[in-house]
Amino acid sequence: MTLSTTIKTLAFASILALAPSQMMAAQKGGTFTTGDKTFLLNGKPFVVKAAELHYPRIPRAYWEHRIKMCKALGMNTICLYVFWNIHEQQEGKFDFTGNNDVAAFCRLAQKNGMYVIVRPGPYVCAEWEMGGLPWWLLKKKDIRLREQDPYFMQRVEIFEKEVGKQLAPLTIQNGGPIIMVQVENEYGSYGKDKPYVSAIRDIVRKSGFDKVSLFQCDWSSNFLNNGLDDLTWTMNFGTGANIDQQFKRLGEVRPNAPKMCSEFWSGWFDKWGARHENRPAKDMVEGMDEMLSKGISFSLYMTHGGTSFGHWAGANSPGFQPDVTSYDYDAPINEWGLATPKFYELQKMMAKYNDGKKLPAVPKAPMSIIKVPEFKFTEYKPLSYGIGKEKESNAPQSFEDMDMGWGTLVYETTVPAIENISTLTGEFHDFAQVYVNGKYVGKIDRVKNEKSLELPAMPQGAQLTIVVEGMGRINFGRAIKDYKGIIGNVTITTQKEDCELTLTPTRWNNSTIADDYQTAVKALAMPTNKMRGLQTKAGYYRGYFNIKKVGDTFINMEAFGKGQVYVNGHALGRFWQIGPQQTLYLPGCWLKKGKNEVIVLDVVGPKGEAGKLGSNVAPTAFCQDHPELDKLNLEKSNKHNEPGHRMDLNSETPVLKGEFKAGNGWQTIKLDKPVTGRYFAIQAESSQSGDRQIALAEVHLQDAQGNRIDRNNWVAFYADSEKGNSTLDKMFDLQESTYWQTEKGANFPHLGIVDMGKEVTISAFEYLPCAEQGAPGSVKAFKLYVKK
């Protein structure tokens, strides 16, 4: 070997020894900027065709497969959120390893010829626990989230600097794949605060993203509220939308700006107690075809949704609408990574926009699908065996007070003699089970907007036990400051002679039960004793199954009630017998040949014989080769059509009547004079098309000062007709892309009644028709009623 050859060999070895991020930085840098009505990649026009993927929702072993699936669709970019709360689960302790290694995910994208768009929050929404904000922020009771609260901003800056350490070396200027970085996320749907958004922009820049292109996303109805002059503005909207209408205002204020839909919603998310959501492939494909034909960039949210493993699924409001574990989203690539019919329809269209080149082949699935025969859970320990921290207090403590992020809190107090039936009232977040002297009395379910329960007569010194399980924190809107457990005091109200007595217990024992794997294993290892003698089969169950070949599968949880599942130490997510999800995705990369451990934490207890007190029958489960995402087991219908709730309006005088204009977009009609009431009713007399079906996306009411009235306490009270998941509450669910829709063939007039929770004064009515092309189902003639 010559000296020259030796030097070359050593130089090559030195390059190989560099860390991956250093190798990226060592590569030749590029540019990504905005030009005249187009983006410019290295100075040349470029249309972003992005696929939204979320690294925490995909097992790391499958990351590259999912990226290749997106490339086979014709995408050139991966778009991702950075989830603050998964990286900083405890204040000051950061984790960017394993499945949290977002830099490795970005490098895989670059390896496969894909660019990357990074959306580092701090808030991300995404149907994710608290929108990505860490729960421990709530330990500071007076914190103002997503505002210039000093503590909040301090923690945001610390987090974004950590993100910068991971990802700033991977920007395109440093030879990496990252071409754009987002500032905040859909802030217009939260508030109007340019100084706050500006401060977040400055933090992002100082974190190492000072040369990369920055942008902010919002809806066409509110993007100007917080739009910063030095950022690119992008729109978010769903399939079927009128695309020209969505970009109309942007074109007026920035005629030379490139257009981009930063979230084109391919489907929608599922909620416990409602049917599985789906959206037509035709609408998605036609919308993307139209955008590409006009040179409009996009990110398809979601291209592959994946799974909200563990306790990471969030919830929506008004009310409390927790999301299921599956984040399938009816996306082109399904939850377990396979191509759907949507995928192939989209791929066929995308091939037209690939510069005449053939799209890559669809990669083979990393695992086959397997079944596992029925197996038994032969080990059991009561729920109380998982108790960790205990605390005495004068009032019930929240999860946050007890320094617990996720799990269950057991509250115990004693009560004086109560001779008659009484009513227990409080704010229970989220699923409370009530016991008197160990005997089960009933449940209080936040999903159903329940706040009270009837209690039997109780002797002197009776023990009242309330077991409260917390589900995902609200991730969208002003209700994201979502504390868990019992919030505030609990009261017991009863009648004695001619008096109504209200008692407030002031001595409580608070006991935490974390929902992690370590707590479950510890509980199962404890010796049997008589701790907390509640008459329930809630608790920890362990079983095993043996397999000769690993593969992806779906564990069927229909034999159990409500809780969490851990397989070989991996948290699969939440299950709940009400559905619609009845199986949990179990990735084959988490299984092993031979014996596999399954632990179930069931806060309710199994169904059937296995759930009966004194029964020795072991509950069972099995794994199937397909998911069950659309099977409901509800105690009663989730439709809002109870006959007793329909108001007789024949003798009432409407406070407003008239006709809406045809077409998309918000319309506001002022009342002749302000009126006060607790209930409002919208009665549709006809539609713009002449059809009998209506679709109403959103409603706002204005107070006497012209401000929008808070809708967090609104409840759907009555609707004469509701089609599928398009129930009455959709007209105040904060989402402009969903709507209350009546069944085809249902006769006019159509009536929707909303309970606002308290009396309010109303001066104007705002109405948004369905946002889809042509505003199908738009109301024409209407009447508005307000009642006390």
Label for each model-derived stretch:
Residues 25-77, 107, 550:
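N-terminal carbohydrate-binding accessory modules
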Residues 466-472, 600-607, 683-690, 770:
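Short beta-strand-plus-loop segments that form exposed binding edges in beta-rich domains
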Residues 152-227:
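Active-site neighborhood of glycoside hydrolase catalytic domains
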Residues 572, 642-651, 661-788:
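Aromatic, loop-rich ligand-recognition surfaces of beta-strand-rich domains
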Residues 63-129, 201-206:
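Aromatic-lined substrate-binding rim segments of carbohydrate-active enzymes
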Residues 92-98, 111, 122-146, 197-201, ...:
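Aromatic- and acidic-residue-enriched segments that line the glycan-binding/catalytic groove
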